[in-house]
Amino acid sequence: MQVWVNGETREVPEGTTLSALLESLHVGGPGVAVEVNAEVVRRARHPEHQLHAGDRVEIVTFVGGG
């Protein structure tokens, strides 16, 4: 099925969870925030949050600096 990730389409298998998507992209950790269809999904829900065709996923990585 097709989902949008940071504005680009990506093919993922049916039943893909948010955790599986992040793992496949080598993204994760405490400095990452994710929203699906404009709603923030808490990290504790990533393993159970299944993606659906057409979902729009935005992944933001926070980087410290100064």
PLM regions and their residue ranges:
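Ubiquitin-like/PB1-type beta-grasp interaction modules and other compact soluble beta-rich domains
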Residues: 1-65
